[in-house]
């Protein structure tokens, strides 16, 4: 059900980290309520990229995305960025009005750079604010490093898996790092 308080979580897998030369391989979204309960998972979309573009990937990306099957999905996909953005927006419209949810995820400013470049209509669907779990990760690592042992990640580098891990990580920080009080 549509709500102003729902949060949009997104993750992209890319050919690299430079939006000037690299491209989006996969996009996934999910919706949580304000209490971080996952209430809907959006489409997981592999985006076709040319062989020339795939050959520009560094060895790390080739190794990871070959092992997780993403390169093969990208080769078989018929979707381009515009179509993937439209399908994602169609899902988001069922859950959150445009301009209301911050963009949520891990190192989300990196994903936003790619959205701005290749899926500007989707990027504009988000509020200008962001909810970046990596901020809490960096603070916890410095201020309360012992809690970091409680965070378990598979590092599958599949977009939907990564988003689920981001939500779980924020739930963990809420319980073990943030001091929440009902008296305030």
Curated annotation (Swiss-Prot):
Keyword annotations from UniProtKB, A to Z: Cytoplasm, Exonuclease, Hydrolase, Nuclease
Subcellular location: Cytoplasm
One GO term describing the cellular component: cytoplasm
Active-site residue list: 128
Superkingdom assignment: Bacteria
EC number: 3.1.15.-
GO biological process terms, semicolon-separated: DNA metabolic process
Disulfides per UniProt: none
Chief localisation class: cytoplasm
Sequence ranges assigned to domain Exonuclease in this UniProt record: 7-170
GO molecular function: 3'-5'-RNA exonuclease activity; nucleic acid binding
NCBIfam families: PRK05359.1
Physiological role: 3'-to-5' exoribonuclease specific for small oligoribonucleotides.
The family this protein is said to belong to: Belongs to the oligoribonuclease family.
Protein's name in the database: Oligoribonuclease
Gene this protein is translated from: orn
């Amino acid at each position: 059900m549509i709500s102003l308080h729902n949060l949009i979580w997104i993750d992209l897998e890319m050919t690299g980290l430079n939006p000037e030369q690299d491209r989006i391989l996969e996009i996934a979204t999910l919706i949580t309520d304000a209490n971080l309960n996952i209430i809907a998972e959006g489409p997981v979309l592999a985006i076709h990229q040319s062989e020339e573009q795939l050959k520009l990937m560094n060895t790390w990306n080739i190794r990871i995305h070959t092992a997780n099957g993403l390169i093969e999905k990208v080769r078989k996909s018929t979707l381009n960025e515009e179509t993937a953005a439209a399908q994602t927006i169609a899902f988001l419209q069922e859950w959150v009005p445009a301009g209301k949810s911050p963009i949520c995820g891990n190192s989300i400013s990196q994903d936003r750079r790619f959205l701005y470049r290749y899926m500007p209509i989707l990027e504009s669907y988000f509020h200008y604010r962001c909810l970046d779990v990596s901020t809490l990760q960096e603070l916890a690592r410095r201020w309360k490093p012992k809690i970091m042992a409680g965070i378990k990640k598979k590092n599958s580098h599949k977009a939907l898996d990564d988003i689920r891990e981001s939500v779980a990580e924020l739930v963990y920080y809420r319980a073990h790092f943030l001091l929440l009080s009902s008296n305030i």
